Amino acid sequence: MIDDRAARAWAILFARAVVGLIFFMAGVWKVFQLGPIGHVQRYFLPFQHTFLPTWSLWAVGFAIPFVELIAGGLVIVGFQTRPALLSLGIILVIVTFGHLLDKPLYALHEHVIPRLALVLLVLLLPREWDRFAIDAIFRRSTPSDRSSPN
């Protein structure tokens, strides 16, 4: 029988693995198959006709694939989990803004909301529950510091 502490650790591992994989695999596809420039051209340059400066479309569109790849990988292994999740949350805000700029009634419930729910779940669960993370190894090897943002 699995006790409550172990069940919580497994639950957060599964949630962390799923949200990490979603973003990591999106990053893999965007970096290695589509290419960062292709990502900009396909998903960001169509917004050139808006008030957004073209340089910002290039900068954000080029960076997102790498952030998804790196932050997703960090979430999977549980290293610097909270900063990685904050990065992914920022990406979700950017993506939501872009979709709503294009279509004000965009169906957020299909893609954005499930990802946001997982990001928030893992972000808000107590760090102490996440026993199967690299962050947990560092917590065990150093004195507890409740003011740490990680």
Where on the chain are the PLM-derived regions?
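Short, helix-capping/interhelical loops that line the mouth of catalytic, cofactor-
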Residues: F47
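Glycine- and aromatic-enriched periplasmic loops at the membrane-periplasm interface
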Residues: V40-F44
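Extended, low-polarity transmembrane helix blocks
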Residues: M1-H39, T50, T54-I70, V77-N150
